[in-house]
């Protein structure tokens, strides 16, 4: 079962609490169209993007070990995050721009090279899997200790 992080965020329009499920988030970025640069969250199950007050950097702190990659938008160098579960392909186009393709026909033009994106994905996978392995080891040791206690 995929590990899930629930984020407590605040809606941009009225500051009310919004709870987001990390496994449903495709990407997070700052809306370049908005004057106040609100953060936008796009989810897999819902076509509607949500605007929140928290910055992508602040959100990334909570999602770093949950399979998210941090990169920078080419047009304004703002931070963008994407979930590696929704990653499809990354390549350089004819103009030399790096394009990241995600599920739901989402394209991101970023400053990082495809090699850098690849390394970031591997690092995100490693962090994600390491925590799963550590949790499994702890569960096994706890179960072994419980079994020993029952035998005694």
Language-model segment annotations:
Residues 1-152:
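Eukaryotic intrinsically disordered, low-complexity regulatory linkers and tails enriched in Ser/Thr/Pro
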């Amino acid at each position: 079962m995929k590990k899930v992080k629930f984020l407590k965020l605040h809606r941009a329009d009225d500051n009310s609490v919004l709870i987001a499920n990390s496994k449903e988030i495709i990407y997070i970025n700052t809306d370049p169209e908005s004057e106040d640069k609100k953060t936008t969250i796009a989810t897999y199950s819902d076509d509607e993007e949500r605007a929140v007050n928290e910055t992508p950097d602040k959100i990334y702190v909570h999602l770093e070990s949950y399979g998210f990659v941090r990169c920078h938008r080419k047009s304004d160098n703002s931070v963008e995050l994407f979930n590696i579960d929704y990653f499809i392909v990354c390549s350089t186009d004819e103009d030399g721009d790096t394009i990241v393709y995600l599920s739901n026909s989402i394209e991101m033009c970023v400053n990082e090279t495809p090699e850098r994106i690849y390394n970031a994905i591997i690092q995100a996978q490693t962090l994600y899997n390491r925590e799963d392995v550590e949790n499994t080891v702890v569960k096994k040791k706890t179960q072994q200790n419980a079994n020993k206690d029952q035998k005694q």
